[in-house]
């Protein structure tokens, strides 16, 4: 098979994965990244010796990530992982707490402190989550999603039990209410809808596969942060011969010979777009998933804040009602990541870096309304910062007077990096079959493919890598057909 020319537009994790795998097959690959650095949303910053990720902060499905590096011939570049136990600490407004562990018995013990009956709920919930994983999760991830017919055929191969598990799925909140009596654990389960930028009151119970994945495969920290993983991917693709252009905003058009890509004015046989399909397709009326507002903090000295912690607001349903009405939450849930709790390389001695985030509504895509939303953020940011500080100090009072802001990221910043409306995942996966309506990898013209968190199979580092693998697989098949 002769070497074909492939353009990859976007240097996020999905684009890097696709570029590397296509180069490994012998294709001549050129990657165009509009920003000054690779990684897409998976960026990291260094501030006075602190290293802080500004995008994803954890890793699941480690075997998938290792497998990708193995396919790239780059296991020697892969940073080591540390599995976290406990995985995350949860705080509630009534002073109660809950800790998630990989060890189900320890998690059940923590749940029983809220109410003894919740011990049984932990076991029954995770059993049903595992069934959903087998019924829908595994077939969803084993091949590119090309339509419900192919997906249901993969489900059917798992037997009638899998078919029934898929048919009875309700919302994620309804599933949580079925197994848990306390609002605490219903909130805990509901939070996993936000991994795709959705509301637990409108997202499918299929999202229960996320806590199952964390329980079954663990929550991991990459030494040096996710930014170190991006650096390793960048080294891998360059070593494979991929030509990388940074600070280059590429455009493409379909022509008889293939695709002309500007500004290089060269013709390519195939194009992989590592950008949200909604932005590329300009669907301004498409509802968007949530965005986020991030503070990067420096703390004087070390802190008792665990690696991952969540501080819930008091009324979870109201919080999502406000967010999807385009408003900031009055009492937001706050997530904090303290990577130096596990990895001393992330901060110098005597100092700590914290990543702190709240959910935020995506900005409108229509130009006039988008301009107003950007102006609104200029006046809203200070209020959101105060809410985040108040909640952080309420649950970790030793932080008072020791914290300094060293950076922030708003939906405006995400939009500037190409996220439609600043939405983290673009497509909104609400509805019973929401996850299966996600934009597909195959584009609308021959030889065009998409990779990234906005397409199948979804967001998060391993799934974005998988989208890159699928895009490379489909592009290679196309190139063989036209060779």
Regions found by a protein language model. Name each.
Residues 477-483:
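Active-site-proximal substrate-binding core of FAD-dependent oxidoreductases
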Residues 248-348:
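Mid-domain catalytic core of redox enzymes
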